[in-house]
């Protein structure tokens, strides 16, 4: 609870600026990273994320997706999916074999969204990097690992827009992954 409250305090409630879609996409393409703060169960937000990503892809943006929904131990399976060596059903089975609560299947979340992100990446040739440290670390240690992983992806993909899909409470406040990543 304190963790979430620190995010709320850091985010504040000030409205900064309103942008039309065209300007939002233009500005996004000029950045090193786009941070998509996630509410893991919010299907309307997820639909907006996917629409935004599709429009970025249509505008020619080359992206790399960094996903909290994927555990680092699952990176080889995700890579196999992205290259066509596994289909979605096999990928889901691989992830469930390691972790019954895989975000690709957990009904308490919005699993179709997380599957759609991977499908999007495959269709657009976008690399994916797992963010969730596995085995799962305590929150304070996990945020440092998340930030380091994002910084490493920036170095690995300097010519791509990083799209970071991460629970919003990690972004600011106690977790402060945005600042800690240096991206």
Predicted feature locations:
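Compositional signal for N-terminal targeting/processing segments
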Residues: 1-183
């Amino acid at each position: 609870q304190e963790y979430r409250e620190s995010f709320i305090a850091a985010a504040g409630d000030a409205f900064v600026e309103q942008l039309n879609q065209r300007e939002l996409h233009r500005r996004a393409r000029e950045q090193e990273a786009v941070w998509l703060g996630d509410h893991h169960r919010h299907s309307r937000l997820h639909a907006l994320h996917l629409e935004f990503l599709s429009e970025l892809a249509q505008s020619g943006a080359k992206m790399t997706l960094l996903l909290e929904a994927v555990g680092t131990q699952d990176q080889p399976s995700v890579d196999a999916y992205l290259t066509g060596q596994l289909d979605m059903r096999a990928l889901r089975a691989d992830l469930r074999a390691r972790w019954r609560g895989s975000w690709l299947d957990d009904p308490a979340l919005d699993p179709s969204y997380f599957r759609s992100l991977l499908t999007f990446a495959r269709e657009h040739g976008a690399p994916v990097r797992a963010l969730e440290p596995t085995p799962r670390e305590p929150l304070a240690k996990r945020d440092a690992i998340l930030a380091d992983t994002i910084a490493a992806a920036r170095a690995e993909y300097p010519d791509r827009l990083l799209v970071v899909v991460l629970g919003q409470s990690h972004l600011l406040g106690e977790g402060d992954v945005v600042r800690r990543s240096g991206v």
